[in-house]
Amino acid sequence: TLSSSSAASDVYKRQVFTLIVLFSGIPIAFGLSFVSIALLVSFEGFQMLDVFAETFYAGLNSFVLLSIPMFILMGMAVANSPAGKDLYIGLDRWLWRVPGGLVISNIGACSIFAALSGSSPATCAAIGTMGIPEMRKRGYSDQIATGTIAAGGTLGVLIPPSIVLIVYGIATGTSIGRLFLCGLIPGFMLAGMFAIWALIHSYFIDKDAAKALKNRKRPTLKEKLEVLPRIFPFLAIIAGVLYVLYGGVATPSEASGVGAFLVFVMIAVVYKIYQPKKIWNIVKVSMKESVMIMFIIAASYLFAFTLSQLYVTQSLAQSMVELSSNKWVIFILINIFLLIAGFFLPPVAVIVMTSAILLPVITTFGFDPYWFAIVFTINMEIGLITPPVGLNLYIIKGITPDVSLSEILKG
């Protein structure tokens, strides 16, 4: 039996080895798989290779996971239609008199699009492509134009149907429908806080916003009304998907399939997108995104199994419990850990890798697992706009290559 000091030393060595591999530039899924195989073989022997294959498969052997590619397909269908543009234009025309109305329009469009796609990158790309050039054209600073979309895009991981919450539900065994319900109000509250900040900033601080409002041509009532028929069908789909989820009519997997089907019907009717080539392009992009996420989930599941098999999970959980008897001290330390993890890893990987460690600690100290899920997700939101990974930052950089990453980060 190893002493406690040598056991702790082994845990730290494994952590350092994992970090070295992940920071080497290897794709996350391949890096986690390599670390898992190396650790299992070195400590347990080559007979663990069979277990490796079984565990990798088990990580994807869940019917609920079917909802992820369906929601991605739903989001990609909307992203490849002019829906984002119509959402943006519609909100802009109705909010034109409000100081910072263009910023608020972007945030509102991000919120609605997030409820359609469940994906932060898709939200950034769809709304940013239209919103950023328009804001720059009307005199807003590059920081405000890019930062608004980068931050607004993070709502995609909190407002249901959120892929991150689906993965959390699968990893922790919590109800996905209840997680969606828990994320709904905080998501729109966060969007409201973004909007209030935009209003205050534009009215009292940002002179560019005042100039943009002064130079703005007033939209006519006809222009305001003509965009509504293009927006209402998508709002109806959001309401329908949420209703069948919360009303107990369908499971998340079934609701995602119905939502994807309705979105395809809607883009065919409203935007005349029904050509096989265009549909295939949407499906192809969705498949690539889905396979990437599924690979990360399977590799993270394998990594979590490896940590548990080598008693790393149990050691870390016990160490965290012994750090302090004050539950709020533990809560703050967990938040710091999640923030740092979110800086370097995608949300899906962080959830699958750490939930087995953190959930027992959280429940031991009496925290509600659903409440903690929202706190967890908000930490992942921060990671999406924080270097060195900061996925949203690089998506915005791709839309505006002439704006430096530091300017986007300041925004």
Question: What role is predicted for each listed range?
Answer:
Residues 36, 171, 178-289, 393-411:
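Long, contiguous bundles of hydrophobic transmembrane helices that form the permeation core
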Residues 82-83, 97, 130, 134-145, ...:
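Juxtamembrane helix-boundary/capping and inter-helix hinge elements in multi-pass membrane proteins
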Residues 13-23, 34-41, 69, 73-77, ...:
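Generic alpha-helical transmembrane segments of integral inner-membrane proteins
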Residues 68, 100-114, 138-155, 179, ...:
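Alpha-helical transmembrane segments of multi-pass membrane proteins
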Residues 42, 46-133, 280-365:
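Membrane-embedded alpha-helical segments and adjacent helix-loop junctions characteristic
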Residues 1-8, 12:
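Single conserved hydrophobic/aromatic residue that forms the stacking wall/gate
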Residues 17-19, 34-42, 130-131, 259-267, ...:
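Hydrophobic transmembrane alpha-helices of multi-pass, membrane-embedded glycosylation machinery
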Residues 13-16, 30, 69, 103-108, ...:
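Hydrophobic alpha-helical transmembrane segments
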